């Protein structure tokens, strides 16, 4: 199987439309194949190649997903984690990595103090001395400091571990060019082998989810989570600028893909998409 030529692998993705309709061309190809005296052996060979393509693609896809995740968890928990904890402990680094953490910590401590005063005023909490009140606030401040110390450590570990796992993923892609080619052909065959209605449904689902009317709220949550994941300041100007530009760029690329590729490969799917989107 390793000696098979790649031109035997099916890739119906980029068939260009010509003067003769594709349906007529496929009908003649089917008739020619049925009249071929060696058609039975060719069908068996095509089935064998298709089976090899499916097994190889699924195996490589599992490797691409599982191996970087395993490397990420192992490196983070057994190599990067202990090293970062040791460095942080013996260098007495500040609790906060950015101003956003400080603002959240101060707001949380302020809410705690205001809650105590409010409960004392309405009588749900017994009045305590100023010394006891300061002790409670101090204890809460220590808890908040421990929480944000853990968050800062976690962010540094995420940056290093994610960098390693991304490097491993890129290395797998670079070293597995043959497997990548087979996987790409396999995925193209699945996507472009869907019915026109299924294609149109997936297109509408994708566009409404990522570039639709409600997508800015989702993008805001995603960007804030990513910034917090890497310990970066949650700059509102950057978030709003990203939301204002990236979905528009994504929409432009998507429309170009429909015009440039999908319109040639499956014009009926494009027509179905426009009808469903109206």
Curated annotation (Swiss-Prot):
Keywords: Antiport, Chloroplast, Hydrogen ion transport, Ion transport, Membrane, Plastid, Plastid inner membrane, Potassium, Potassium transport, Transmembrane, Transmembrane helix, Transport. Its main location: plastid. It is found in: Plastid, Chloroplast inner membrane. The keyword Chloroplast applies. It holds the Pfam family CemA. InterPro entries: CemA (IPR004282). It is a multi-pass membrane protein. GO terms for molecular function: antiporter activity; proton transmembrane transporter activity. It catalyses: K(+)(in) + H(+)(out) = K(+)(out) + H(+)(in). Contributes to K(+)/H(+) antiport activity by supporting proton efflux to control proton extrusion and homeostasis in chloroplasts in a light-dependent manner to modulate photosynthesis. Prevents excessive induction of non-photochemical quenching (NPQ) under continuous-light conditions. Indirectly promotes efficient inorganic carbon uptake into chloroplasts. PANTHER family: CHLOROPLAST ENVELOPE MEMBRANE PROTEIN, CHLOROPLAST ENVELOPE MEMBRANE PROTEIN-RELATED. Belongs to the CemA family. This is Potassium/proton antiporter CemA. It comes from Cyanidium caldarium.
